[in-house]
Amino acid sequence: FSYLMQTKGETNLSLQLKFWGQDEWRTSEFDIYIDDHLLTSVNNSHRWRTTQFKTVDYAIPSEFVKGKKEVRVKFVAHKGKQVGQIYGVRLVKN
C-alpha cells in the first residue's frame, strides 16, 4: 500500500510511523520506499512486546524530496511476511 504525501517544498524531513507494540502473531518485515527509492528495511517481528503505541522516525535523505511538492510513500512486505499494523503515517520536519 502507499500514500501520496505533501512535502510543502521542505527537504529536511522524516517519515514518522506509529506502530502497535504488541503483534505477537505476525512476522512483520517490510521495505519503505520514497518515490521508488528505498528508504529503509524494517523488521518489527516481536520488537516491543508492549500494549502501547510506539512511534519511530526515519530520516529522509534530502535528495529524495528536493524540488518536490509531494512524494509517494510505499510499504512493501518481504516475501512471506507482512507489513504489520501501522496506525499513523506523517512527514515531519527535523
Feature annotation, model-predicted:
Residues 1-12, 18-94:
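Beta-strand-rich ligand-recognition modules
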